[in-house]
Amino acid sequence: MYQPKLVGKSIGIVFGSFAPLHQGHLDVIMRAKKENDGGCIVIVCGHDGDKGEPLLPHKKRYRYVRELFADDDLVSVWSINDTKIGAAPYPDGWEKWMDEFNSIWHLAVKSSLFPKAKWYVGDECYYNDLKEMREDVVLLNRTE
């Protein structure tokens, strides 16, 4: 499926297993889209046998999220399957996961403008890990 490249000074990054996708996820995606002039990249994450597997395999979750935003040029949906890229389970798989993310970034973003990435996370563990690797990370209050 063709996705136009995102263009802007900043791009939001939202990732999760989306098992299942719910209103809280949609609110985060809309916030990232609103706060970044270039829109946002949504990454559906998972691995073979993850928590969503019994009802919604990773591939199906990715397809649902991608179809939901198919007509939105400011939301670019991608997939990272930890098993397929050989990443160890969290918290040990960040290096391979980030390598895969960097590949996606180059495919999804018009990089000649050198936009900033702004990460949106709702889990303090992810926040702490990402703050060591990336500059702009927002920890969301999941109770709001």
Region locations from a protein language model:
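Nucleotidyltransferase catalytic core that binds NTPs
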Residues: 1-144
